[in-house]
Structure formats: structure tokens, C-alpha cells
């Protein structure tokens, strides 16, 4: 079968190629043209351009010529002015611009005209940096060639006349052999500075216009000068041109330079040599300075000029005697770095709008003799405001004193915010203080000295009252060691020290104030006898005398403890009302029904999964409904609607309120609407539970069912201490008024099971001995305990009897129960205990926590509970390597309020295998600070850990360690690693010792060191750093490489434009071929062949034709531009 060839009609392919660019769209041509121009412009680098002046009288005058691409050409004078001339003169090393000359001033040039409509600002470094129409673009002839006249300044002179010396007087300039003056239009201190510097007369003191030094004669050479103050000569300033002005000699300007002025400065009527009213000697006479615009920058210049220490305050309207005579200066405006007051901007000498009651003054100090403190208030954060400046004590006058000023004082002293301010009246007889007067603070200042216009040294306070302040940190309270939110041992912070409070010193009113301050509602109970464990450290020797309505404990008055002494065994504890809004609904009386609680503002039913008779007893007691008679199962009083709380209470039955009971919510089982707690109380408000006898406590003889209870309760109490939670620790029993321990003789899991069950802590997973949780104190109540494991209370087990033993406290027994929960952040690649995978210890094993619904609030609870920080962030897993681990719980959702993760609702406990992508990874904000330094980037290193600030020991402390600290604080590179308490000794724990950083760690937490809190140092070895305070940012630049990339990019765009044009031409040609084959009547064979080819394609032919709609680069083009089809196709005929 013969091959079919399709021959396109029309001209040959070569002819079509000749018409290719005629078919290109105009926009493609424009793109190529623009890019070609860009390439040309880009190729004109700065290095291949030169400039010269020709046909002039010397090297600094003549016609301007520019060399571009090895060809010299001229510049057109369209728009030519002094700004352009200034650039050329400076570029050619002839710094003084004299004249902008056109073609008439120099012979016309020849060749190219390279630049036209040049427009300079005057500060460019080269003429081609100015705007212009483009290289070689112009609309002028060589008759408009631009020229300039410059000068190297050697023929120019300047002098000061009629001032009495060579450094003061009327300014005169010699130009072209003739002396002339300068007009005072827009003349200022910057111009005067250039003149004085040029004449080597020191700095400029003042300037004056209006021919103050007499009228000159001859030309007026300059008008409307524009100087920056940095010029080397007056004629290098911008100007309209030599001899161009609109002035007469009545406007001649003059200057007084420092070397020609009789100027002096002094402070008078102050309490020290470096304080008082400011006076200036000018032209032989002393005068004052007006306080308009007077501020700390102005005062700083005065103090520096007088050789006094740093300025403390800029005083206006001083209480000392007023000055007299001239008021020399007004509206001073200093930057603060001037060496003399008269270098600052100001009105002309002697021009002012003031009286002497506005005379300015200063107080200078280097800060070492400047102190602020609160005295007589019981702590460093309360009392009368006392200031000490240069060894002189003073008080703050109540005039202008308010809560904003008090807030600044509290902030400066590190005492939080101001709670109240008050005054203390003194009689005139005692009014001998040196007073500090304030003219209002904004409240945003970090120091009282930052408040504007405070005055020091007055001996009269109108009302004879001194200011007093109470700051929030005066007595900052917290509750420690409680198993529930808003409960625990009372600890109060005075300054930087936490201490406990004796149970005899804390009244119900004081407890009410504490609960209110901590936003914990109302007080439920006050518990003495170290109910929440003994504290350590300070015991405050003061009795709180609150009225009960105060908002903060700091607002209560205090008195010395009446009995004088106290020990930690009497530390007071408080339980506040987190769970006191309770009720019974759907019962036939107020004392029976479905149990409901109000939590976070919402009422809901309580799940009955952990509801027992002990919980019910406390519930009835709180409602004043007697004791619990039964706890009916099912939805005995209706299913209820709305929220079902899954909180699990762990009451012993002896508590007075539900808030006294430990509570958990994490991992609680799900509840349906029918699984709600109910109770039937006795209704007798006076009825209480009586002690049980031995028979009633014997579980083998008890007839008590799950729904009814005997109306008695065991007299003993049981607790676990030092275990980190309510379900682990040393066992302690309360008997005959004292807490005591249990000896570990014969102690085993059967005994431990009873303890765990009694406390509602599940089952025992470990029975510990040998004082595993530390040695206790007091009696050892039980020894040789032998339980069968079924007893409900530990004292039902056989033993030697109460108080009968042969042990010491080093044998105290302990237990870890299955319900014991602990928390940690762990990352196997880091030692940082405040960042890593979130894990909980439950039922004797560690497991991770899922990240589903994990919120910022939940992260905050975790970080606070671990004592790491107040907030943190959720991060991806630290390793990309997929791993599988056991997960305990998921969907933890903490609302606002809980203090521990245990009080947060979640999905039920369920151990399962989970991938690392399902786990929660948290980084708590590692808190680090520098204290007592001269700036935020120097000082003693302090770390926040375990809920308190502590220091770092200087053992092994070096520059690599300091480098990490400075980087972590954003303070740039470290300058010094300081030892031996270089910035003073800290307080509190010494958290780290033997730190050994490499220097590239991102946090001090990442560096090797001893375990946290393990140190053999004292605070005299506290480590410190001094950082550079410069945040380094590395940048790299490669102009040559950048230019190469630009050129390559432009070439690529041009190539792309060409390919687009070729594609358009190819498509157009193909369309013409098809029209020719199908429509030409004189060649009908072509029509038949074309139709037959399309109608007889078989399925196997599609493989050849569906790969591309059009021929591509692999198609076989012959010399004539024909396309060969190698597949034989049948033709039906």
C-alpha cells in the first residue's frame, strides 16, 4: 500500500519564515524592545563612565562632558541649576559651586549629547545618579551645552566684623576679590556652626540678624542658605547662586562663636553644688533660663557641662528664690549629647516670653546617690514614700500625687501595682522635710525619675502631708498543697520571700479576703495544725486584722503576734468555695433529690460513677440537711437535662463542704442522662454522724448496702504526704489530736490496698517502706499491721495497737495507689524538663496525652502545674521518625480556673497504642531574667523553675554559657561571664550548677548541668552576664552575582518571548494548511484523501495519533517542510 503525503498549498516554508516576525503580535515586539533597552542600560555600569570640564579657565570650570561606552559627549542645559552644579563640583574635587553656565560661557562641543533634563537633589555622589531622560536621549543642540564654574575654595575668604574679636561679628565673604555680606533669611544655628567651625572659633553660641553687628557694604553674596551643619565651608551649603538675593544690608547676619563669647554657667540656691536655679553669663551679665520646653535632655547637657553627675531632674518653677536681671534663653531644645547648653536650639539671646517665676533649674546625680523606698508600712512594698538624693532625705508632697504616681513607685520597686495611696499629715513644726514635688506621671513610666518636671529641694509643702503607698506585692498570698482548686496552706509573700502564717493569726475575715483576692469565691473553712502539710522557711510574726470587705490581703492592718512564737506544725490552711453552689432537685422535700452543682456559672447534674455514701454525707451536711440516709441508683429523681458533670469527689465523710474534698475530672468515665447522682438526707439539721463501734466497722458483720448507710463514721482520719498527690506518699493517721505515721514492719500490698481503697485511690501498686517519702514526725501510731485486704479502714486491720511499736521514723510506711497521677514533659533528646511530650502517670505507668482539642488554656494549666511558666505553646514532635507509644487519655479540655490538669474534663482513661503525631508536645516559656544590672542586658542570671525564681552557681561558668543566656534574651553576643555575685547576691533556690554549654544552644535549659536544685554553692557565687545589647543579623550580598542573575533573567525573558512568537506563527500556518486542503476546489483528490483518512482510522491507529494534537519536536521534517505519515491507511473507493 502506498504512503499518503499531504502537501500544503501556498508558498514554501522558507517564505513563511521570512514573514514570521510580520505576524508577531505588537505586544511581543514591544516586550523585546523594552528588554533590549534594559540590557543596554544594565550594561552601563558606574565603572565605565567618566566626567571632565573642558575649555574653561582652570580645572574647575568649563563645559561638562561625560564619557559613556568609550565615547565623550556633552550635557544639555535644560533645567540646569545650582543643585546640578553642586554635584559636579563635588564629584570633581572642586567642592564650591560658583555658577551654572550655559553654552555662551564655553565653546560648543561636538559628538554625542549624552544627557538632557538632568534633575539633581544636590546630595548625589555622581551626576549620573541624578534623574535624566536616558542616555543619548535629548531635544537640544550643542548650542545648549551645559557648563559650570566651581572653586577649590583657595581664592575665597571669610571673616567676622564689628564683634570685638575675630570670633564674633557680622559675617563677610570675599569673592572675586570683593568682600560682601550674608542675608539673614532662614539663617539658623546650623549655619552659624559652619561659620565657627570654618574659622576655627569653636562651636556656635548664637546668631543674630537685622544687622545686629552693624550694616555692611558692598555685595550681598548669599541668601537663603541651606546648611546641615556638617559642611567644611559656608559656600559649600546649598544656595541660589553667588550674588542672588532679595535683601538689603539691614538684614546682614552675624554670629558669636564659643572662643569669642564671654559665657559661663552656674547653679544657685540649690541644696548641693550640683542643684539649683540655672544662670548663664552672656556678654558680661548673668541671667536666667526660661523653663518653656525645659526637659531632661536640657538638664543632662547642663550637668555634663558643669562636671556634675548625670541629670536627675529638670526643675521648672522652683520653690527657691526667683532670679533677677536678664532672661537670656527660652525654648531650649537639646538632644542631650551637646557639650554646652548654647549649642542647643533656642530663641535668640535675650528673646523670651517668660517671667522669673518660670526660671529653670536642675538636680544632677549619677544614680548612686538616688534612692526610693517605702518605710513604716511593714514591708518594702508599703509605707511612706521616701527619697534620698545626694545623701539628703526627703518625702513626697501630696500635691500632684495620685494612684498613677503610686503605681510607678510600686513598679519601680518590683512590688506589682498600687492598691491604694494615702497621706499622712504633719504639723508646721515638723514640716522640715526636703520635699519632692511631682507634676503628674502618666503611669507608664518605669521609674519615678522618668516622670516629667518633678522638682526637688523645696522646703514647703502646702498641705504638710506626705504620700503613702500600698502595693499589691506588699502581702501577696497563695494556697499551696491542696488537692482541689482554691485550697491549701496559706503562704504570703513579703517582698521576695514567701512565708507561712500561724493558725492563731488568721481569722475568718482574713480568709474571706484571701479567697476574694484569689478569685476563689467565699471561704468554706479554716484548717489549722498544718492540715495541708508543714511549710518551710519564714513564719510571719504578724496577726492579720481584716474587716472582711477588703479586696486584697495587703489592705488589712496587721499587729504583732500576741503569743510571740509559732512553728510550722501550726501552719494555717484555707478552703475556698469552688464547689459550694449545690442543690437537690425533683425531690419531695428540700433534702432529697438529684444532685446538681454549679461550675463555672453553669448548673449540671453530677455523674454517679464515683458517687458514694461518704460524698453524700458531706453533701447533706453542706445543705444543712443532716446526714445521708441513702443514695438511690438510676434516675430515681429524674434524668435531668443539660450538662452532666464528671467530677469525681473523694470525700471521707468528715468534711463540712464539698469544697473540702479532693476532686478529679481527668479520665472520668462517660455518663448517660440516667447515670446521675441522688441522695436522701435525714433532714435533721442537728443530726451528725456518731463514732462507729467495732461491730459496725466490721465489714463481715455489716448489713449496709450500696444505697443505705449506717449513721456513723470512723473517728480517725488518713492522709498521704510528700508524694506529689493525694494518692501517693507517706501514710499518716490522725488519732487523739495528733498526726502520726505507720511502721513498715510486715507492711505489704494487702495493707496498702486498704489504704488506697479508704482514700478512694483505687488499688495499691506499690507498698513502700524505709521512709521512701521522707521521715515523718510525731507519734508512730501503728506497727505490724496485718490486713486481709478487705477492710474498709486501716485501723480495722490487726496490729500491736495504737501507739505500740519498736520503730523509728526511718521505717515510715508509704504507698502508691493506682489513682495516683503525676505529670511530666519529656524529650529523650533534651534535658529540658519544661519542654517535650506531655505524659501522665496513672495506674502505675507513664502514658502520653492526646492532642485532640488541646487548647492554649490547657497548656497554661500544664505549665503552671509543672512550675515552668504561666504559658506555653503546642509544638510538633521533636523527631520526624514515626514512633508508637502507650497513650492514657485524650480530649483534655481545661476551662478557665483549674489549677491542675486533674480537674480538667477529658475522654475516659483508656490505654492504647498511639503514634507520635497523635501526642501532645508542649514547650513552656522558659523564663529567664537578668537582675540588678545597668540595663536589661546585664545582671545576675535568674531562672524560673518550680514556681519560684532562683539563681545559677558560677562553678564552670564561662563565656559559652553567657553566650547562650544573651542569645536567649535577644541581647546579642556576650561580652563577659561574671562570677562571685558581681551584681549582688540573689535569694531563693540556686537552681543550676556546673553549667557546661557549647555556646550554640538556643536555651540554657539545653545545656548540660547538674540536676535542678542540686548545688553546693551559696549566693555569693551567683553567676552573671554582660551582653552587647546588639541583635546580630547576618546578611550576605553579592552585587556582581546579582547583576549576572539579572542579565540571565532578562535573557530568559527574551528567549521566552521569541518562543511564544514562534508558537503563534506555527499555529497560524497549520490553520492555513487545513483550510487549503479542505476548501480548494481545483484539487478534489486532496479533499477525498483527507476525508477518507479521517473516516477509516482504526482503534490501533489511535496510539499513534492521540499522543499529540499537533506535530512535535520528534516529527520528521523534510527539506521541503513536509510531514511524513508512516502508517499506511486504506482508502475506500
Swiss-Prot record:
<feature type="disulfide bond">
    <location>
        <begin position="303"/>
        <end position="364"/>
    </location>
</feature>
<feature type="disulfide bond">
    <location>
        <begin position="397"/>
        <end position="461"/>
    </location>
</feature>
<feature type="domain" description="SRCR 1">
    <location>
        <begin position="51"/>
        <end position="151"/>
    </location>
</feature>
<feature type="domain" description="SRCR 4">
    <location>
        <begin position="372"/>
        <end position="472"/>
    </location>
</feature>
<keyword id="KW-0325">Glycoprotein</keyword>
<comment type="function">
    <text>Involved in clearance and endocytosis of hemoglobin/haptoglobin complexes by macrophages and may thereby protect tissues from free hemoglobin-mediated oxidative damage. May play a role in the uptake and recycling of iron, via endocytosis of hemoglobin/haptoglobin and subsequent breakdown of heme. Binds hemoglobin/haptoglobin complexes in a calcium-dependent and pH-dependent manner. Induces a cascade of intracellular signals that involves tyrosine kinase-dependent calcium mobilization, inositol triphosphate production and secretion of IL6 and CSF1.</text>
</comment>
<feature type="disulfide bond">
    <location>
        <begin position="953"/>
        <end position="1017"/>
    </location>
</feature>
<feature type="domain" description="SRCR 5">
    <location>
        <begin position="477"/>
        <end position="577"/>
    </location>
</feature>
<keyword id="KW-0812">Transmembrane</keyword>
<feature type="disulfide bond">
    <location>
        <begin position="196"/>
        <end position="257"/>
    </location>
</feature>
<keyword id="KW-0732">Signal</keyword>
<dbReference type="InterPro" id="IPR001190">
    <property type="entry name" value="SRCR"/>
</dbReference>
<feature type="glycosylation site" description="N-linked (GlcNAc...) asparagine">
    <location>
        <position position="331"/>
    </location>
</feature>
<feature type="domain" description="SRCR 3">
    <location>
        <begin position="265"/>
        <end position="365"/>
    </location>
</feature>
<keyword id="KW-0964">Secreted</keyword>
<feature type="disulfide bond">
    <location>
        <begin position="334"/>
        <end position="344"/>
    </location>
</feature>
<feature type="domain" description="SRCR 2">
    <location>
        <begin position="158"/>
        <end position="258"/>
    </location>
</feature>
<feature type="domain" description="SRCR 8">
    <location>
        <begin position="823"/>
        <end position="925"/>
    </location>
</feature>
<feature type="short sequence motif" description="Internalization signal">
    <location>
        <begin position="1090"/>
        <end position="1093"/>
    </location>
</feature>
<feature type="domain" description="SRCR 7">
    <location>
        <begin position="718"/>
        <end position="818"/>
    </location>
</feature>
<keyword id="KW-0597">Phosphoprotein</keyword>
<feature type="glycosylation site" description="N-linked (GlcNAc...) asparagine">
    <location>
        <position position="139"/>
    </location>
</feature>
<feature type="transmembrane region" description="Helical">
    <location>
        <begin position="1045"/>
        <end position="1065"/>
    </location>
</feature>
<dbReference type="GO" id="GO:0009897">
    <property type="term" value="C:external side of plasma membrane"/>
</dbReference>
<feature type="disulfide bond">
    <location>
        <begin position="756"/>
        <end position="817"/>
    </location>
</feature>
<feature type="domain" description="SRCR 9">
    <location>
        <begin position="928"/>
        <end position="1028"/>
    </location>
</feature>
<dbReference type="InterPro" id="IPR036772">
    <property type="entry name" value="SRCR-like_dom_sf"/>
</dbReference>
<feature type="disulfide bond">
    <location>
        <begin position="894"/>
        <end position="904"/>
    </location>
</feature>
<dbReference type="GO" id="GO:0006953">
    <property type="term" value="P:acute-phase response"/>
</dbReference>
<keyword id="KW-1133">Transmembrane helix</keyword>
<dbReference type="Pfam" id="PF00530">
    <property type="entry name" value="SRCR"/>
</dbReference>
<feature type="topological domain" description="Extracellular">
    <location>
        <begin position="48"/>
        <end position="1044"/>
    </location>
</feature>
<feature type="disulfide bond">
    <location>
        <begin position="546"/>
        <end position="556"/>
    </location>
</feature>
<feature type="disulfide bond">
    <location>
        <begin position="620"/>
        <end position="681"/>
    </location>
</feature>
<feature type="disulfide bond">
    <location>
        <begin position="607"/>
        <end position="671"/>
    </location>
</feature>
<keyword id="KW-0472">Membrane</keyword>
<comment type="function">
    <text>After shedding, the soluble form (sCD163) may play an anti-inflammatory role.</text>
</comment>
<protein>
    <recommendedName>
        <fullName>Scavenger receptor cysteine-rich type 1 protein M130</fullName>
    </recommendedName>
</protein>
<feature type="disulfide bond">
    <location>
        <begin position="76"/>
        <end position="140"/>
    </location>
</feature>
<feature type="disulfide bond">
    <location>
        <begin position="120"/>
        <end position="130"/>
    </location>
</feature>
<feature type="disulfide bond">
    <location>
        <begin position="227"/>
        <end position="237"/>
    </location>
</feature>
<dbReference type="GO" id="GO:0005576">
    <property type="term" value="C:extracellular region"/>
</dbReference>
Amino acid at each position: 500500500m502506498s504512503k499518503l503525503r499531504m502537501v500544503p498549498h501556498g508558498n514554501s516554508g522558507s517564505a513563511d519564515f521570512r514573514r514570521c516576525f510580520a505576524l508577531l503580535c505588537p505586544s511581543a515586539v514591544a516586550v523585546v524592545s523594552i528588554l533590549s533597552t534594559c540590557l543596554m542600560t544594565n550594561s552601563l555600569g558606574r565603572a565605565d563612565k567618566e566626567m571632565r570640564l573642558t575649555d574653561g579657565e582652570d580645572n574647575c570650570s568649563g563645559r561638562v562632558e561625560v564619557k559613556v561606552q568609550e565615547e565623550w559627549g556633552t550635557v544639555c542645559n535644560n533645567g540646569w541649576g545650582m543643585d546640578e552644579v553642586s554635584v559636579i563640583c563635588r564629584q570633581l574635587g572642586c567642592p564650591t559651586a560658583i555658577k551654572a553656565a550655559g553654552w555662551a560661557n564655553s565653546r560648543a562641543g561636538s559628538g554625542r549629547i549624552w544627557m538632557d533634563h538632568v534633575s539633581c537633589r544636590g546630595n548625589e555622589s555622581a551626576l549620573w545618579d541624578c534623574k535624566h531622560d536616558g542616555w543619548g536621549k535629548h531635544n537640544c543642540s550643542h548650542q545648549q551645552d551645559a557648563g559650570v564654574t566651581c572653586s577649590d575654595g583657595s581664592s575665597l575668604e571669610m571673616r567676622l566684623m564689628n564683634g570685638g574679636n575675630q570670633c564674633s561679628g557680622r559675617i563677610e565673604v570675599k569673592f572675586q576679590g570683593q568682600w560682601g555680606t550674608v542675608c539673614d533669611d532662614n539663617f539658623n544655628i546650623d549655619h552659624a556652626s559652619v561659620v565657627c567651625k570654618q574659622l576655627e572659633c569653636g562651636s556656635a553660641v548664637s546668631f543674630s540678624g537685622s544687622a545686629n553687628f552693624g550694616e555692611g557694604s558692598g555685595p550681598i553674596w548669599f541668601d537663603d542658605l541651606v546648611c546641615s551643619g556638617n559642611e567644611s565651608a559656608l559656600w559649600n551649603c546649598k544656595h541660589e547662586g553667588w550674588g542672588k538675593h532679595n535683601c538689603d544690608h539691614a538684614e546682614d547676619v552675624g554670629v558669636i562663636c564659643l572662643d569669642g563669647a564671654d559665657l559661663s554657667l552656674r547653679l544657685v540656691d540649690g541644696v548641693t553644688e550640683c542643684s539649683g536655679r540655672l544662670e548663664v553669663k552672656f556678654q558680661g551679665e548673668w541671667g536666667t533660663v526660661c523653663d518653656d520646653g525645659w526637659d531632661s535632655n536640657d538638664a543632662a547637657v547642663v550637668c555634663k557641662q558643669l562636671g556634675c553627675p548625670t541629670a536627675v531632674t529638670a526643675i521648672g518653677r522652683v520653690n527657691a528664690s526667683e532670679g533677677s536681671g536678664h532672661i537670656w534663653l527660652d525654648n531650649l531644645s537639646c538632644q542631650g549629647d551637646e557639650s554646652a547648653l548654647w549649642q542647643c536650639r533656642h530663641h535668640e539671646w535675650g528673646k523670651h516670653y517668660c517671667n522669673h517665676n518660670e526660671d529653670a533649674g536642675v538636680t544632677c546625680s549619677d544614680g548612686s546617690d538616688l534612692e526610693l523606698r517605702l518605710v513604716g508600712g511593714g514591708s518594702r512594698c508599703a509605707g511612706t514614700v521616701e527619697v534620698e538624693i545626694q545623701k539628703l532625705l526627703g518625702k513626697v508632697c501630696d500635691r500632684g500625687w495620685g494612684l498613677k504616681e503610686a503605681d510607678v513607685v510600686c513598679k519601680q520597686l518590683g512590688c506589682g501595682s498600687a492598691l491604694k495611696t494615702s497621706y499622712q499629715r504633719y504639723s508646721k513644726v515638723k514640716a522640715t522635710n526636703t520635699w519632692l514635688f511631682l507634676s503628674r506621671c502618666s503611669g507608664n513610666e518605669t521609674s519615678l525619675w522618668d516622670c516629667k518636671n518633678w522638682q526637688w529641694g523645696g522646703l514647703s509643702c502646702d498641705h504638710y502631708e506626705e504620700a503613702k503607698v500600698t502595693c499589691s506585692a506588699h502581702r501577696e498570698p497563695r494556697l499551696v498543697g491542696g488537692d482541689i482548686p482554691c485550697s491549701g496552706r496559706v503562704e504570703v509573700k513579703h517582698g521576695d520571700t514567701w512565708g507561712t502564717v500561724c493558725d492563731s493569726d488568721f481569722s475568718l475575715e482574713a480568709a474571706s479576703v484571701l479567697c476574694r483576692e484569689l478569685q476563689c469565691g467565699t471561704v468554706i473553712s479554716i484548717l489549722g495544725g498544718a492540715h495541708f502539710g508543714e511549710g518551710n522557711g519564714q513564719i510571719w510574726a504578724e496577726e492579720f486584722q481584716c474587716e472582711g470587705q477588703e479586696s486584697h490581703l495587703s489592705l488589712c492592718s496587721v499587729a504583732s503576734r500576741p503569743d510571740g512564737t509559732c512553728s510550722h506544725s501550726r501552719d494555717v490552711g484555707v478552703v475556698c468555695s469552688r464547689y459550694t453552689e449545690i442543690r437537690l432537685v425533683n425531690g419531695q422535700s428540700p433534702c432529697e433529690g438529684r444532685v446538681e452543682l454549679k461550675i463555672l456559672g453553669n448548673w449540671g447534674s453530677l455523674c454517679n460513677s464515683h458517687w458514694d455514701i461518704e460524698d453524700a454525707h458531706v453533701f447533706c451536711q453542706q445543705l444543712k440537711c443532716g446526714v445521708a440516709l441513702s443514695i438511690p441508683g438510676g434516675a430515681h429523681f429524674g434524668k435531668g437535662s443539660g450538662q452532666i458533670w464528671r467530677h469525681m469527689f473523694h470525700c471521707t465523710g468528715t468534711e463540712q463542704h464539698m469544697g473540702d474534698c479532693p476532686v478529679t475530672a481527668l479520665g472520668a468515665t462517660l455518663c448517660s442522662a440516667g447515670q446521675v447522682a441522688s441522695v436522701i438526707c435525714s433532714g435533721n439539721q442537728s443530726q451528725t454522724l456518731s463514732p462507729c463501734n467495732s461491730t459496725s466497722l466490721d465489714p463481715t458483720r455489716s448489713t449496709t448496702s450500696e444505697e443505705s448507710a449506717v449513721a456513723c463514721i470512723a473517728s480517725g482520719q488518713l492522709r498521704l504526704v510528700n508524694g506529689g498527690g493525694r494518692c501517693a506518699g507517706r501514710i499518716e493517721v490522725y488519732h487523739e489530736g495528733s498526726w502520726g505515721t505507720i511502721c513498715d514492719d510486715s507492711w505489704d500490698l494487702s495493707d496498702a490496698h486498704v489504704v488506697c481503697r479508704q482514700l478512694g485511690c483505687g488499688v495499691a501498686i506499690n507498698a513502700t517502706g524505709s521512709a521512701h517519702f521522707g521521715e515523718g514526725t510525731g507519734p508512730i501510731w501503728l506497727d505490724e499491721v496485718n490486713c486481709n485486704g478487705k477492710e474498709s479502714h486501716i485501723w480495722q486491720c490487726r496490729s500491736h495497737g495504737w501507739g505500740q511499736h519498736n520503730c523509728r521514723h526511718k521505717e515510715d510506711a508509704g504507698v502508691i495507689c493506682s489513682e495516683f497521677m503525676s505529670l511530666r514533659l519529656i524529650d529523650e533528646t533534651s534535658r529540658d524538663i519544661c519542654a517535650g511530650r506531655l505524659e501522665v502517670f496513672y495506674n502505675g505507668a507513664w502514658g502520653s496525652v492526646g492532642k485532640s482539642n488541646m487548647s492554649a488554656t490547657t497548656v497554661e494549666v500544664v505549665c503552671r502545674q509543672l512550675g515552668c511558666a504561666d504559658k506555653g505553646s503546642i509544638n510538633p514532635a521533636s523527631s520526624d521518625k514515626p514512633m508508637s507509644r502507650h497513650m492514657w487519655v485524650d480530649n483534655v479540655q481545661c476551662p478557665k480556673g483549674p489549677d491542675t490538669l486533674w480537674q480538667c474534663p477529658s475522654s475516659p482513661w483508656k490505654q492504647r497504642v498511639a503514634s507520635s503525631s497523635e501526642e501532645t508536645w508542649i514547650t513552656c516559656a522558659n523564663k529567664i531574667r537578668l537582675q540588678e544590672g545597668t540595663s536589661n542586658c546585664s545582671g545576675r542570671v535568674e531562672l524560673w523553675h518550680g514556681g519560684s525564681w532562683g539563681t545559677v552557681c558560677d562553678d564552670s561558668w564561662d563565656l559559652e554559657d553567657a553566650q547562650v543566656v544573651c542569645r536567649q534574651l535577644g541581647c546579642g553576643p556576650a561580652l563577659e561571664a561574671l562570677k562571685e555575685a558581681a551584681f549582688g547576691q540573689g535569694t531563693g533556690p540556686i537552681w543550676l550548677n556546673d553549667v557546661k554549654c557549647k555556646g550554640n544552644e538556643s536555651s540554657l535549659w539545653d545545656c548540660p548541668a547538674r540536676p535542678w536544685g542540686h548545688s553546693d554553692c551559696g549566693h555569693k557565687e551567683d553567676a552573671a552576664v554582660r551582653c552587647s545589647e546588639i541583635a546580630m543579623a547576618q546578611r550576605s550580598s553579592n552585587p556582581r552575582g546579582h547583576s549576572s542573575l539579572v542579565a540571565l533573567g532578562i535573557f530568559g525573558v527574551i528567549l521566552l518571548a521569541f518562543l511564544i512568537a514562534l508558537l503563534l506563527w506555527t499555529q497560524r500556518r497549520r490553520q492555513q494548511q487545513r483550510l487549503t486542503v479542505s476548501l480548494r476546489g481545483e484539487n478534489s483528490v486532496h479533499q477525498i484523501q483527507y476525508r477518507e483518512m479521517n473516516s477509516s482510522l482504526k482503534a490501533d491507529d489511535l496510539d499513534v495519533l492521540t499522543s499529540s494534537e499537533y506535530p512535535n519536536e520528534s516529527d520528521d521534517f523534510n527539506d521541503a517542510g513536509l510531514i511524513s505519515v508512516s502508517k499506511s491507511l486504506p482508502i475506500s473507493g
